[in-house]
Amino acid sequence: MRVNLSISLALTAMLLPLSCSKINVQEGAGSLPGNRVLELTVGSGPATKASAGKTAWIPGTDRIHVTFAQPTESGIAISEGFYNIKNSDGGTEPDGKPVLWQNTNPAAIHAWYWPSGDFSAKIDISDQSTPEKVRAVDALSASISDVKFGTKPNLSFGHTLAKIRILWRDESRLWSNWRNPEVLASNARFFSNSMEVSLEKESTGLYALTAGGDAGWIVPCPDEDEQMTWECLIPAQKISGAAIKLTLQKGEEEPYESAVFIEETTFEAGKTY
């Protein structure tokens, strides 16, 4: 099952005014005043929606992919390249061939942080059982329009997946302190219609997040601070029916599996449930 998401629609909307409005297009990049190389910064931290996920950039290790869209006499020119995060202040530098301004017209930028570093690689989301494995699923994006020549835009990244937070709080089975429950819950699972995500380049030259693979159960990460609490990241989708499974055990009794049913719910990217 494949679910095509609309992550790139925001930038497409940004491009429409550039292509439809009357703009005095300036050609002749060789005569541009100042630096032709696109310069940019990133926010202080990638706004991951998972507490066990990525909470800060790692200078010298992390890099982002930038798509740069600018109107020219022949239409919208798309160029792309990678930028390394070079310091804790969010400074960046081109990784390889730099992205260049073609003229002085306002432009649009769409950027991705892909945890594997390989933009052609698919991400398997089935095992998020540790903080490290949650961070391996963090897929972030940022968009900005009407970027003026000679400025240094700041990109604010947000998550492209939805965050699921499971809290087991059956008050009828807890003692006075919920940290010492009468019934222990473990082996949490969360159902997803798609078990992998990838980036695909569209005909517009922009990248879109695509969810695919078989449906199945995700192993979430236990919260490090709250007992009987788990979290995981899933692609945007609709889910109904048995969505959560827990293994429950009271004392020395035989453990049993309990399923939690939910009404049809639309899980949106960047939100917490």
Each PLM stretch: what is its role?
Residues S8-P17:
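Bacterial N-terminal signal peptides
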Residues R2-L5, L18-Y273:
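Sec-type signal peptide cleavage vicinity
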